[in-house]
Amino acid sequence: DMESNETDVRWYPLFSLLYTLKGRCDSLKDGFPDGEVAEIDDTVRSVLTGLSDCFTYGLLDRDPDSLLRVFRKVVELDESYQPLESEVLENNDSAQGCALSWFCQLLNRGLVGAVVDILARYENITDYYSYSLFVSSDGAPLLKTILADLAPLTFRLPTTISLPSPTVSPPPSR
């Protein structure tokens, strides 16, 4: 319907920005054949999958502010990445690897944490699997802190989201 179309348009910039980040990851892969850029690529892909689930199952209607929080976080990451990207591409020395490694950690912590934050805010979440595929060991301490605040969703991400219904009662008005 018209309202859902407006919602999709409203959040299109978030998807656009994530795909832009993914494109930048692809452009850096040639210079870094080891797993660093692939890790970024997997992270961004997992974010897109999680957000697609939010749209597919109508979760935006229940907590639209959650996507706004993620959008702001991704914008911050994108802005912080732009000067780093120039530095990485211009300097062909060991500092290049250090900079990209730092960015991998930043993007993993920020985006994965934000997706966990979105999905943990919905009550009817089932069928979890380990989140460890999406985060490096360096990022794990921060994610553990984030996830500790989101019990009972402990160190897990949803693979499927089940909603009661077709007659879901609207959330209480604020």
Regions found by a protein language model. Give the residues of each.
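Intrinsically disordered, low-complexity Ser/Thr-rich segments densely containing proline-directed motifs
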Residues: 1-2, 174
